[in-house]
Amino acid sequence: KGFTVTLLTRVSKHKNLIESLGIQVLDWPFTRGGGNIFGGVRSIVYIMRAIKHSNSNIIYAVAIKPIIFSSLAATLSGVKNKIFTLGGVGFIFSSNRVLARMIRPVLIKVLRLALKGHKTRLILQNKDDREMFLGYKIIENERIILIRGSGVDTDKFFPRKLRKNLTTIILPARMLWDKGVREFVSCAQQLKEDGVTARFCLVGGVDIQNPESVSVAQLKKWTDQKVVEWWGNQNNMSEIYSRSTIICFPSYREGLPKSLLEAASSGLPIVAYDVPGCREIVIDGVNGFLIPFKDDNSLRDAILKLVKDQDLCHSMGFLGREMVLKNFSQKIISEQTLSVF
């Protein structure tokens, strides 16, 4: 499209692959969790050096901390064109913990400053997040762009033939309490006690930098008790979905979860809470079930209904796939995102 792109990131094993696409990669020793004022200042300096090195005239950043650091660095470097994406509002906005409630007012003020400027635009992934940002007066409506998700590769994630053996129900997410891990395990325990024969599998790694992280010890305890299986972090999720029957995703709040887009593209029915982000993907009774927040009985009943009815699983999975092809494919979302630049 005529852009020269420089990526500032914590360099990993993917550097060569990214550079093979014609993108220059610069190392940024950035950590998401914790941190202090000195780490923040160092990050801003790194970004300013990258701006000078690449002679950038547009800054694009994703997630709260990179947005804050990049915005200040861009302002100090004289760059006015800033485009930011928030895939979700994170722990500070979604949690009711004391720490989150204490930090939230400060973060709101910082975000107001970071998102100032008529050439600064913010991409959000669902209407609920947009209404929240408008309610807090963080940014004006005309500078918010709603793009639903980051897109899914529908050629990679496609429906497979449903296996007629043991039903496999998975929660594909980082192992965080606010992703609904506790509720998933409780549901598994209740259904097994009721005589339901199925595999309940947690698919995702721990995130020690997140205050909501579930401990490895707790995950191993559940596994030892044969309540659930923990498969850990998986690189080939298309293969995981091909071995799955139902997605159970009782997350408390999302931006627009890529895992659910991939699952829907793979032709799987989804059971999720009726919360921001999830309700953008799941239409109740069409491609899955939306459950009132923290309603354990309804969550269990919805899973049981799907376990007992393979035809319903298939029809809901088919409609989910059609929804993704129409609204959420990588091509559609990429075109919408490029139009912002």
Located regions from the model:
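A conserved mid-protein helix/loop that constitutes part of the nucleotide-sugar donor-binding site
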Residues: 176-190, 297
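Glycosyltransferase donor-sugar binding loop
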Residues: 8-13, 172, 199-214
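Conserved acidic donor-binding segment of nucleotide-sugar-dependent glycosyltransferases
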Residues: 284-285, 289-296, 305-310
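Short hydrophobic beta-strand element within catalytic cores of glycosyltransferases
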Residues: 269-272, 282
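A short, well-ordered alpha-helix in the C-terminal region of glycosyltransferases
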Residues: 298, 305, 312-327, 333-339
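Short His-centered aromatic/hydrophobic patch
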Residues: 61-67, 86
